Amino acid sequence: MKLIFFVKDGCGVCENAKEKVDFFLEKWNARESVDVETVNLSTSDGLVEAAMRAVAEIPTIILEDTTGEVARWMKKAPPSEDLRTRLGV
């Protein structure tokens, strides 16, 4: 599984969402089974990646498995139980 965080410099909500997800990954001992990637929309590469994935809000968190996108949460961290269920931990 892979979590992709779309964030922007100076976004407090983005930082809080990432901290919340990091906390639960650690709590559930899921850190090694979930790759975490951060895409910064303050960069041109980040803007291109966001456009390719139709990301229009920050933060946006996308969960992917080997088949593609499994879930997407926008403007906030995912609810912990929803994330846990989707990760299967």
PLM segments and residue spans:
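Non-catalytic, surface beta->alpha helical segment in thiol-disulfide oxidoreductase systems
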Residues: L63-V89
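Structural micro-motif
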Residues: R53-I62
